[in-house]
């Protein structure tokens, strides 16, 4: 029996417990004469087995169409057998069917009553025939034999596809028939015998044509260009050869299966083609699929798109050997090297050694921190535990001078002894009472056979078996239907195998296939011996990617066969696959052979004209080979190290190694009836299906993805280079990267191919490497540094100079440093600088000079303002004179005089395009008006790129239901879907390709979710739909775009004066604003041209609503621009007279001029725009309808030695408590009770003579029942706490006292304690409490109040903050905490269901270089569609994939896929900030983790929150200053 069936049956038996007792037919429905019809009964009484003999016609009708077949017609006849069975435990019964023919059987409960229920049904064939088949994608070979082992010649085989007869064939000699027509079911007739079964055709077969497809590298970032090359091959005369000139179509699909690229190519004369696709910066990350269509065939390839950061150095871990014996020392060597081969000296290495036993969970063995030596090496020795068997894994986190981290792991195998115990079968199936025999090999680790005694044990029995010449036979007889674990030990070594005693036996471990050799050549004749303990009949398949031959076999004991190895095999492995039967049941056996192929691959060389290059040099590559064309590319070695992928090997692609055959070989599969509504099988069928995740997305590429992105990942890409006389030369400029590039070349001719690799090292004997942040903020003080590398063989006097721009000043010391550098060494210098003023274009230059050697690097280091930009904006439709006041301290200003709205549209479009965020609405609002503007003749810069970026993001954000929401996650929104679909329509109308799959899904969504806006959009697409009946005035607005009647109805809601007009209409949807509705109204007016004067006034209204570069939001701006473009109004104008403070000047239409602070008076006629940008330096928190707070927490790693694991403790920055140690403790056992709801069901617990009858969340005391939250006792008092009340029962006085308006209650040594609104009551004393207190955590002696993220300790008349919360605190003395369910203040994970002792020190929680910090932002208030922005310090490396460690996690516990479960809709990490987008505030905080990569004083702008689509709500925190490093302590009691 195959493992899949075995696992399925085990699953059945486990699942049966869901439904109580059960009964079902077991084993196969094809039976041989006198073989028992088998069924199982467990925990059921009076189950009746009924058996009917039926006709061939009824059998075929029933098995082909069981859902339609009327089984009651069979059941009304008298059965040939009927008997009742019962069993209290699992028991298998058998009823013999002697005569050949067809049978129907049922298992029925309550037979003969009105409660009769059919539990299971089945159809059976009793036959003396058996069948075995082998198949690939092109053919199937079917062997038919009888129960005596004779193969049946002349049997009629009827072939069916989807229950329809498609052909009839007959078996030939040896009972075999070869069939090329595809079918799924067959029916055999031979004399009076019949057989029925199903088959599968496999995916294997001869690949007569292959496509080799390669991209220049395996991974890309959004905005990169993907280069690809394809080569088609055809199989001729046993070899693959290049194809001829032909045509192919290449299609590329994004992660949502939307087509984003399609192109047709004409190949060269060898069947080669190449192309490229530019990814926009909005391209979704994940796995992209490539389809290549050629000649009716379709090929699939993939590439990965990720927001990665390329590492600058690599970490390698070596061991002195791969296999160890317990007790030995594992000697690890950690090598840290830059990609140019130079060592990373003095790199900090945090290391963790974990042990993973073969059984059980892994645990921490050893940890520490050290530094690499001058050669970039760190040596570490770890002794393995005695008797341990499993693996040891070293995990390292390395940081260099830049403080960017790289991680690496290395595992080794550890054996308990120099002994290897190898059962030939790890999983054995049998039936209760039937003995199994398992052959076991016992050798040393080198494979030498051992002698001695093997100890076996199972449950309570232990025995020994003799091992002779490395072999032993272990026998075991299961007694019950269950699984058994058989332990095997020899010396210190041990292992196990499993016996599943639920069904028939499987392959005996004594069945052996012995080929004369495991290495063959095409055309060889191979001698194969088969050994078996008894009589065997079956088929030997010669298979690999296809079925080459099948050989029928029938023998007793042994047989010798001669097997011909196929001459035209293109695979490097061949398999001997045996399928058959012996006395124990079915046999499956597979042997793998190596095939020595003589392929048509030739040699190739890549020669560089130098061993090493300097950045910017010209390099020449020479390629030598006897092929015609070469595909050549050079990729940064860091890419391959980061991804862990190598360029594909062409020879192995054409002539592959095979681990398993791609063919099918086995017995036919059989039918099962699922026709009883109440049958157990139907209940199982209703259980949820197993789900699998298979999009290969590596959502959390590990933190190896670090360091800089300044230089190209692909240095050279030449898809097709011709060779002349076997040689080609290429010259190119070497990139500025100091690294190594891997050169890969594939060579192609008609019948010869080649591949080779080489390395190009880019380095210098003397060079420097700056360590700078990505930006600074005004007033930041930071230590910047640069490392100089001297790779010469002599000592050098070095001068290292930093040249700073005017806006960055040096605080101490000289800008030039002088030092001596030893040969082959590195040296780092540090400068403390301060950012004085803002500048986007500031550059820092480093120059190093050592005698006649030098290097210089200039890097941009922008300085941002420590301020928020504000805007004063006015539009005036001037016809006369107007005066206003211009604010001071502005950074830019202008007044502009216009006679056309086009400049306004152009400016707003540009601001829309440059808007920094990218939800669905903002993406749509960028390119939708851009498309319409371009169609109206307005020039839009980079329109193609804008559209491509927008389409890619919209494809990625479309939901599975076809709709769009605000972001990728969350629910689909009707308005947003309409908005996107309207924009896609106009994009198509403008001549751009839009993925058909996206449109179809969107249309389907609009059909299922009718709306007024959707009705108009469906009309655009010409889709028939039911007319939408307006439910509000806002519906009329959208319907007016396609209905003149709806427009006329809107006239009832128009408000107007001489200059402007607007619709007094509102929508309940917060996404639809008044400006937006009036913009749609203007579009309808422009379309129907019924009310020209009203059209002019609505245009004026919208222009006057413009209060900045935007109309309130990106969405409103987009809608207004669309309306203005359709209305395109004209305005009369004159010369504009301007008086600004003491300045007087005139402007003509189209002219503009800057302004000065003070009054501004303008007079004339036309459109006047005034725009002033000024700065506002935040000094304190602001709260206008919303509240926001920001907190910082430092991570401490705490080792739980008893559990051998590490947990993260995040505690607040500042003066406080530093956690130092943690370990689990046992609860002290007392008579006192502490009971939470649902701990007990229907249980009575007595306390001091008082019975407490507990049932779930209810307790009965003295005849009264209470629904409780908690029950506690102390010193004879019983506390029952329930909603807003507490009850104290005194067992001595027999009295009950009730307390009302209680938030929480507990006990101290002095008596009960009650938390009430605003105070805590201790005896008669009322103590006011902080606002965020939610509960009590008092000990017997200390008042502890539980806050949201801290505990308040009442001491000496005031509250002290403690950096933890706990459900229950047993002890606290100011340093030692004993509690359960502890969560540290900044941690997101609770140490659940355990009591821990944590020891704290009182001291400063300071941020040091390299520390891990968590920023938590908490938001309160009402609002929707909010943006939360937090401005990060300039020294922060945000660890976007950081996973906090709780007691269930280990250091390297990464998940490559996790579903989105955050309360907010989306998050974006940018250079200077982290932004969060929340549709609603149904969560109140978010956090992110960062690493401090530099020392200094860092100024943080306030975190802020504001709505995206409305005004009036706003909040920001206080600004903060972070002091990082020992040299930057400000002396305050807390920080920030």
From Swiss-Prot:
Gene3D superfamilies found in the cross-reference section: 1.50.10.20, 2.20.130.20, 2.60.40.1930, Immunoglobulins
Signal found in the keyword field: yes
Pfam family, one: A2M
Signal peptide from the UniProt entry: 1-23
Any GO CC annotation of this UniProt entry: extracellular space
Key words, A-Z: Protease inhibitor, Signal, Thioester bond
CDD domains: A2M_like (cd02891)
Record location of the Isoglutamyl cysteine thioester (Cys-Gln) cross-link: 919-922
SMART domains per record: A2M, A2M_N_2, Thiol-ester_cl
Keyword Signal appears in the UniProt entry: yes
A GO molecular function held by the record: endopeptidase inhibitor activity
Similarity comment: Belongs to the protease inhibitor I39 (alpha-2-macroglobulin) family. Bacterial alpha-2-macroglobulin subfamily.
Function according to Swiss-Prot or TrEMBL: Protects the bacterial cell from peptidases.
Name of the protein described by the UniProt record: Alpha-2-macroglobulin
